Amino acid sequence: MNRYDELKKHIEENAKLAYDLNYAVAADPELSGCEYRACARYVELCRQMGWPVEENFTKQKTAFRAVVTRPEKAVLKVALMAEYDALPDIGHGCGHSANGAMSFLAAAALSKVKDLPVQIDLIGTPDEELRGGKAVMVKEGVFKDYDLALMIHISSDRTEPNSEVLALSCYRVVFHGQTAHGAHDPWKGRNALNGAMLALHAVDMLRQHVRPETRIGTYIVDGGTASNVVPDRAELECTLRYTSRPYLNEVVEKFMNCIKGAALATETTYEVTPVGLDFDDMVWNKAATEVSASVLTDMGIEYMMPDGSNGSSDVGNVSHQCPALQLYLAAGDTYYPG
């Protein structure tokens, strides 16, 4: 029996566990950093498989690391990454319930392969949609000792042997002013919403002067409470992306100047708070991508190479610490954005 046939056999033997895990997590969505029940399901399954599990991994309450294989003469050390956080309103519309289940299935199948000289860990990486659980792990140096970290991300209609992701920085900006009655004495007020709106106009003008691949998204979180009251507080959320971190840092500096100038012009004050950790762009691993593509070909799965990214993921951070791979696997043949 060759390796593929052996793996196929073990995949089929463990498929129901993975299916049940996927559907259980999908039916019980938990937001980023709050995936307590999902994490507990993974930990229980790992222990049923006989794998030692470290909970609260890197001091993240919904993260874990399970030791899947520890051969005496390992030539490689590989991390399989499992995601399981959901989004507000749409639950597991991004497919993280399936992402994690596929990593578990891969671990379960590989753990049964005889004489496999590879040390394998299954790492539960929560909070991808907000703070970036993998980014936290990178800061702790978790992936320095791995030869490869990989996962599969479900896709609507495209299968790709690897993915490109954009560097991302996200901020909450709060403007503070002075409230006043909008008819009686508005001149006594300092309009925080004016500061926020002027900042948005400045950011819109900035778009002409940044590279075409730059993406800037904004929305008003809080703009006041009544039209006859000068608002003393306004809040924005702003997301900035580019294909590489160094240039994105330049864009962030320009963005901060927009905020600073708007506050100066409206005689308001402001505070800026990062939303989660910075996500980095993906370091493209040619060798791993070629192997991934050859496996897809051997399995008769049609694929396309990435043609530019419009999304971000903390797997990009991982790729700056060790070789990393994130395949996209099509779930259907109709494109859905997101």
Predicted regions mapped to residue ranges:
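Histidine/acidic-residue-rich, glycine-tolerant segments that coordinate divalent metal ions
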Residues: 62-63, 67-68, 85-93, 97-104, ...
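Metal-dependent amide/peptide-bond hydrolase catalytic core
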Residues: 197-338
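Non-cysteine beta-strand/loop elements that form the S-adenosyl-L-methionine
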Residues: 79-81, 171, 176, 325-332
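Residue-level signal for inorganic ion chemistry
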Residues: 25, 137, 238
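Local beta-strand N-terminus motif with an aromatic residue
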Residues: 76, 145-148, 300
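Short, small-residue-enriched loops and turns at beta-alpha junctions
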Residues: 28-33, 128, 158, 224-227, ...
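Acidic/His- and Gly-rich active-site-bordering loop/insert found
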Residues: 2-116
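Hydrophobic/aromatic beta-strand patches that form the interior of the parallel beta-sheet core
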Residues: 78, 123, 148-150, 323-327
